[in-house]
């Protein structure tokens, strides 16, 4: 449910026309995902699917201002400043705010510069906060394994002390474990294979999440030469840095940090596991926290031109192209982990280009789109000597669509995607390919098929 009040207007500032916008908003969001009884009970052929339900409310206020600074000066046909501020009070994440500062510098009818600096936030979603605990039967290592045994001297003494302060673990460690296969008693606290296999865990939401925050810089140049009518060229640079990105914290990390803490057992990480009466692990818990960092930068070059006169051929031809060149795409899981730049990996190719050729008349439209992906590596973290084993060549796909307008409100269309029937890359040694030795998944190259795809339809 949303209720909002907005106001806009113009005013005179030093003889120049400025404009403003302001408003308030009240928003209430509620979401739920209710699996059927079989899924809830885990009787549908898989693990239990949990119930997700949650809600939050937010009160927001914003203001925007657009102010021309100068007009009709040499090399400054117009310079305009814009700014915006917004503050939101979330019932979950608390108070967050966002700011924006921008400038537009029109040199003349042909050239314009633009730039924006902004700080923005993303509050956690209902899924982030309230997602139900889904069960997993993945085992994790127990940092207490080995205490009281022959290897205890090589263990972290803080971990040993914390583990033995649990009377359940201490009692089991003192007794040892009888190994039937070897017919011996293994000293200390250890696990048999069946005990390892009984460990299971749960992953879900975290109601204590905070907001993600982003700093964004964009700089752009627009060139629309008056002496070449119909031509438009834009070049934009972008840089985005996001802090406190919500990502899942592993159960192994949580339990290790618990027993390495000098605040055991009161450290918050210690609530992420439970044990049997014997001291052996029973359940682990994993959830999202604000821990990661993401940084990306690059360039977008767009060119468009319209041929309005095709001579004896009716209609007009519009050509639009955009090239994205990635400069960096860095992801850091935690503040103590090593950042990795993934530019050049499949899905984050150095260059991606799309060119559209569109011919139109009063009734017809024919569009041919080319999609280009530069060569890439399956895994940029691999050893350089293995690059040739996991290299994926550059790829180009062609898509065709034909549309005919039967009336002003009804049209029929026919299309062929992947016109040349080009198969996805084949990389038998790629470790990021979920089916080793097979074609790369469609998702990596924006495809949902492995061959030519035809479709037909109508709209009204």
Model segments located where?
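Extracellular loop and loop/strand-boundary signature of outer-membrane beta-barrel proteins
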Residues: 1, 45-53, 84-89, 204-207, ...
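Short loop/turn motifs that connect adjacent beta-strands in outer-membrane beta-barrel proteins
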Residues: 10-18, 70-79, 110, 152-156, ...
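Transmembrane beta-strands of outer-membrane beta-barrel pores
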Residues: 24-32, 69, 85-91, 117-123, ...
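Structural signature of Gram-negative outer-membrane beta-barrels, strongest in the C-terminal barrel
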Residues: 49-153, 162-165, 199-228, 238-240, ...
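Residues that define the transmembrane beta-barrel architecture of outer-membrane proteins
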Residues: 55-61, 95-99, 203, 213-217, ...
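Gram-negative outer-membrane beta-barrel transporters
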Residues: 232-380
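C-terminal beta-signal and adjacent terminal beta-strands/loops
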Residues: 327, 370-381, 403-460
